[in-house]
A protein has these predicted regions:
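Feature of secretome-associated and extracellular-like proteins
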Residues: 1-96
Length: 97
C-alpha cells in the first residue's frame, strides 16, 4: 500500500481483499474493516490503548481450547450473538407471536 494515510487506509485494506473468493465473507470483512477504521478515527486511541485492546483479545484467545471457545462468550457479552439471532428470526408484520 503506497501513500498510506488516514484518507487512503480503508480503501487500501479493502483492495487487499480482492482475492477472497467467498463473496459473503468479503462483504462481511469489508464492513468490519470500514467500521473498525471509523471507530479508530472517532476515538483516536494511543498505541498503548490499542495495545491494551489487542492484549485483551489475546488473553481471550489464550483461554480457548478444544472445549472452550471464549470468543463465543465475548460475542454473547457484547450482545452480538443475540443481535444476530434477532436479525435471523425477524417476524413479518403479518406474523403473530
Amino acid at each position: 500500500m503506497l501513500d498510506f494515510n488516514e484518507k487512503t487506509a480503508t480503501e487500501g485494506v479493502l483492495k487487499s481483499f480482492s482475492s477472497i473468493k467467498n463473496e459473503r465473507l468479503k462483504e462481511l470483512m469489508s464492513s468490519i474493516v470500514k467500521h473498525l477504521h471509523e471507530v479508530v478515527k472517532e476515538t483516536e486511541p494511543t498505541f498503548d490503548e490499542w495495545l491494551n485492546a489487542i492484549e485483551f483479545l489475546t488473553r481471550t484467545g489464550h483461554k480457548c481450547d478444544d472445549r472452550r471457545q471464549e470468543f463465543i462468550l465475548l460475542s454473547d457479552v457484547l450482545g452480538v450473538s443475540m443481535l444476530i439471532d434477532t436479525i435471523n428470526n425477524r417476524k413479518s408484520k403479518n406474523e403473530t407471536e
